[in-house]
A protein has these predicted regions:
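A common structural junction motif
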Residues: 79-90
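Short S/T/G/P-rich N-terminal loop/turn motif that feeds into the first structured element of a domain
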Residues: 1-59, 65-77, 96-115
Length: 115
């Protein structure tokens, strides 16, 4: 078995997008802890390949990869939790959809991070 890929559809809860963007930009700024958070999430078996915002008020679509053995329930718990993309703000409603790579003869959306 190999790692798994997911498309995650994020919608902002009413009135939360500005605070979320402010928090995200602060985290990504030098010294904001972004690199450390990415490394910690990767160590736990979660890796975000891309984040794709449609507008500042959403939606945002992301491609995530999880290491082998992480269930969809565990992934959803991570995505909804304080170390996921919501920064613990309860700003996002997250719909996680697994990508069935077997339908595309094993083609993955990105090269695997977890082998």
């Amino acid at each position: 078995m190999a790692s798994n890929f997911y498309i995650v559809h994020h919608e902002f809860r009413a009135g939360t997008s500005s605070k979320w963007w402010e928090t995200a930009y602060a985290a990504m700024a030098p010294g904001g802890g972004w690199d450390e958070a990415v490394a910690a999430n990767k160590e736990k078996g979660f890796f975000n390949h891309s984040a794709n915002a449609v507008t500042a008020n959403g939606p945002v679509y992301c491609i995530w990869e999880t290491k082998e053995g992480i269930s969809i329930e565990e992934f959803q718990e991570f995505i909804d939790g304080p170390t996921g993309p919501g920064f613990g703000l309860s700003a996002l409603m997250n719909i996680c959809k697994p990508i069935d790579t077997s339908l595309m003869i094993g083609q993955t959306p990105y090269p695997r991070v977890f082998s």
